[in-house]
């Protein structure tokens, strides 16, 4: 089972083994990592049988796979972080789009209100002019 827990990208992987295919007569236990901290227990490399070339090769392969696994997990973590950044940018762009649409609607409403008010002002000016004319006619007839 693969864990979904994140491995820090800056966490070093320590792998120690001999690239010499000949088995040592006195292998050093310190040279073989017993634990890869980022791996689950069932994925940990088992210590090799030092008398078996095949066992050492399998162990080396397992260590290389563990290192590749660490690199893949690191890349996945970076990609997930990038995904979060892109989602945040997309959310921001959608919010700005909605804000722009709202501003367009508000502008259209204000433009219509302005047109209506100009028409009302024009009617008021016309009525005022008619009242002046009527007032002048009354003044002239009295």
Curated annotation (Swiss-Prot):
Transmembrane segments: none
Tissues/organs with expression: Ubiquitous.
InterPro entries: Map3k7cl
Entry text on domains: Contains a C-terminal domain similar to that of the C-terminal section of MAP3K7.
Name the record gives this protein: MAP3K7 C-terminal-like protein
Gene name as annotated: Map3k7cl
């Amino acid at each position: 089972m693969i864990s979904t827990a994140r491995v820090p990208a800056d966490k070093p992987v320590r792998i120690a083994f001999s690239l010499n295919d000949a088995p040592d007569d006195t292998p050093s236990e310190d040279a073989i990592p017993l634990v890869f901290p980022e791996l689950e227990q069932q994925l940990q490399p088992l210590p090799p049988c030092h008398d078996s070339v095949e066992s050492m090769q399998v162990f080396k392969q397992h260590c290389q796979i563990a290192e590749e696994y660490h690199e893949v997990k690191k890349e996945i973590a970076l990609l997930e972080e990038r995904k979060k950044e892109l989602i945040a940018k997309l959310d921001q762009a959608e919010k700005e789009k909605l804000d722009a649409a709202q501003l367009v609607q508000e502008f259209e409403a204000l433009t219509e209100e302005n047109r209506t008010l100009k028409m009302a002002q024009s009617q008021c000016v016309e009525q005022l002019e008619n009242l002046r004319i009527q007032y002048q006619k009354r003044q002239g007839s009295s």
